[in-house]
Amino acid sequence: MVVYDLLVSLSKESIDVLRFVEANLAAFNQQYIFFNIQRKNSITTPLLITPQQEKISQIVEFLMDEYNKNNRRPSGPPREQPMHPLLPYQQSSDEQPMMPYQQPPGNDDQPYEQIYHKKHASQQVNTELNDYYQHILALGDEDKGMDSMLKLPEKAKRGSDDEDDMFSIKN
């Protein structure tokens, strides 16, 4: 009866809006909540809500109340059992029981360079890169001319002292 009274008081435009709301109720829910919050806070922050918006808000509020009444779970103690009883897991005899992860033996305090390669490898690479960088800077020096372009830095020319050094440059 309340909904009927409200519908009678709505204009044709409002009924079109209501049909749109009915078709897109999920999208309208956010707007309804927005209007409802603003209506409740209108004492501190006055807001201009049109009568049409107010009536739509009342209709949606009434419909939500009816929906909640009809779809409420029956009162009583909460269900403790799931809908389908779970079967206990039975381990077959040929399956290995799961063991907790064990870290392989080794010194955890070793730095990455010692594990992957020698400790001084990255330092040597840095010095060689620095030499090449200086060589490239020297290429732009006009006093040395074309001869400086053909010469490599001294450290790059000589062979490495370590035979197992993977970063050495051999001529």
UniProtKB/Swiss-Prot annotation:
Signals that turn on the gene: Expressed in the late phase of the viral replicative cycle.
A single Gene Ontology CC term: virion component
Signal sequence region: none
Bias type Acidic residues, positions: 161-171
Cellular compartments annotated: Virion
Region (Disordered): 68-112, 152-171
TM region positions: none
Presence of the UniProt keyword DNA repair in the record: no
Keyword field contains Metal-binding: no
Main location: virion
Source domain of life: Viruses
Keywords: Late protein, Virion
Family listed: Belongs to the asfivirus H171R family.
Name under which the protein is recorded: Uncharacterized protein H171R
